[in-house]
């Protein structure tokens, strides 16, 4: 399967009214690690505690530079005879080079897998229907399973959905078995919309090495260990926590505008009768009736704050709650 495989794009839907949908994750990439030093190496690289991660678990975490700024956020899990992380396609090449740079003193193999298929499945009755394809599926108590040449991750935000690391043959089997259901396909913009609503950060290359993990809510998502010892960026990340230095947080906005803001641009916020630049956009997605934005803003903004896209005086956006905050 070609690295750029994707299903045709259709306008994404909210999780509230999403029909059963099989989603190609062409904007994500899979990097694997194995070898006798893989645990020690990854413990020195990532912000999570690699040693405490169980085989049937995954975690959100970050890979940072020495200043604690995030190269990228990742899904991290046990995979085959080692570990895997799923990261954004736009950053994987740079991340791969950095991982290999720091690996010269370790016995560890690091590989990018373009022959694996990354799929998402979400929407109406997704649990029941996936259970008709696989003999067992993951849940909140066991969020990762490995079966039929496939690894399946369960995500419960913003609604039940699953991420699959699989093969072309299994993908074809899934499509064949789903023909009797009213299933639609979509590309990764649908998964992006779900991640925005869930509050799972999206770091593409343009925003790489700009933000501390706390500003991305990674601590709230359980992706930072403060007990594991040294790793890249650890001093800055710990100092930010213990000196209460973080003044930013990841937010979810919903509203309307004449254009979709791009990653790295600023928004405007209304303060009294004036508009001021604020925040940094991480991702945005057009839905059928509105636009969703993921943005890093100052912490503790009033819930009734009004924001808009720069240069679009008719646009209006409001904060939406994130369930883990």
Curated annotation (Swiss-Prot):
tRNA processing listed as a keyword: yes
Subcellular location(s) per record: Cytoplasm
Protein origin, superkingdom: Bacteria
Keywords: Cytoplasm, Folate-binding, tRNA processing
Residues reported to bind folate: 28, 191
Annotated Gene3D superfamilies: 2.40.30.160, 3.30.70.1630, Aminomethyltransferase beta-barrel domains
GO MF assignments: folic acid binding
Main location: cytoplasm
Gene Ontology terms describing biological process: iron-sulfur cluster assembly; RNA modification; tRNA processing
The keyword Cytoplasm is annotated on this UniProt entry: yes
One annotated Gene Ontology cellular component of this protein: cytoplasm
Record-annotated membrane-spanning stretches: none
Physiological role: Folate-binding protein involved in regulating the level of ATP-DnaA and in the modification of some tRNAs. It is probably a key factor in regulatory networks that act via tRNA modification, such as initiation of chromosomal replication.
Family: Belongs to the tRNA-modifying YgfZ family.
Matching PANTHER family: TRANSFERASE CAF17, MITOCHONDRIAL-RELATED
Name of the featured protein: tRNA-modifying protein YgfZ
Species this chain originates from: Baumannia cicadellinicola subsp. Homalodisca coagulata
Biological classification of the source: Bacteria, Pseudomonadati, Pseudomonadota, Gammaproteobacteria, Candidatus Palibaumannia
């Amino acid at each position: 399967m070609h690295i750029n495989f994707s299903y045709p794009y259709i306008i994404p839907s909210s999780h509230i009214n999403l029909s059963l949908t099989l989603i190609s994750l062409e904007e994500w990439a899979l990097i694997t690690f194995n070898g006798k030093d893989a645990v020690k190496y990854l413990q020195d690289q990532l912000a999570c505690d690699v040693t405490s991660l169980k085989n049937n678990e995954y975690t959100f975490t970050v890979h940072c530079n020495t200043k604690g700024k995030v190269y990228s956020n990742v899904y991290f899990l046990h995979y085959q005879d080692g570990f895997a992380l799923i990261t954004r396609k736009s950053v994987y090449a740079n991340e791969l080079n950095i991982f290999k740079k720091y690996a010269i003193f370790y016995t560890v193999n690091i590989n990018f897998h373009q022959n694996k298929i990354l799929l998402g499945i979400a929407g109406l009755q997704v649990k029941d229907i996936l259970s008709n394809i696989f003999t067992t599926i993951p849940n909140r108590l066991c969020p990762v399973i490995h079966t039929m040449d496939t690894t399946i991750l369960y995500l419960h935000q913003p609604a039940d959905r699953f991420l699959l690391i699989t093969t072309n043959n299994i993908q074809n089997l899934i499509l064949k078995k789903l023909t009797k259901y009213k299933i639609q396909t979509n590309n990764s913009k649908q998964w992006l919309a779900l991640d925005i609503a869930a509050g799972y950060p999206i770091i593409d290359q343009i925003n790489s090495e700009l933000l501390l993990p706390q500003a991305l809510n990674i601590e709230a998502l359980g992706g930072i260990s403060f007990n594991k010892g040294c790793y890249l960026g650890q001093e800055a990340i710990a100092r930010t926590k213990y000196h209460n230095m973080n003044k930013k947080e990841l937010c979810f906005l919903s509203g309307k505008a004449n254009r979709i803001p791009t990653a790295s641009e600023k928004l405007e916020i209304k303060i009294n009768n004036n508009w001021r630049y604020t925040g940094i956009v991480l991702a945005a997605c057009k839905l059928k009736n509105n636009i969703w934005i993921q943005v890093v803003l100052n912490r503790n903004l009033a819930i009734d704050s009004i924001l808009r896209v720069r240069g679009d005086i008719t646009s209006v956006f409001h904060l939406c709650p994130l369930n883990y905050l």
